[in-house]
């Protein structure tokens, strides 16, 4: 995740799209997880599949990761530059039905960055998807306050 000013740089539409400056694209997905299968894996395998240490969240060295680790394939590195999104996961559960998962939301300056990340996850066999199933997915455009004002005034 970007931090500080990078959050704005990667999460908010800039001057390149003047009609929508300060807006954002948001992509939301609901995933259900097979936690029994995940927990059956040794911690070392879980770390290889995610690409990070389980308890410290420190990124593994490239040679320690599975080639289809989540943090390897869920990237957009066009033109040798890492393109980022602002992301967040929130857990949910329906204990009576044994359902557990996360809601993912990502904010992006450019929708195609999120699209590329998702395409890579599904075409490069992201190891996380062996244990997580996407249930829903939605794309939203979030207008800036100026754009909302223009709509309210009948200018757009």
Can you describe what each PLM-predicted range is?
Residues 1-156:
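Long, histidine/aromatic-enriched segments associated with O2/redox biology
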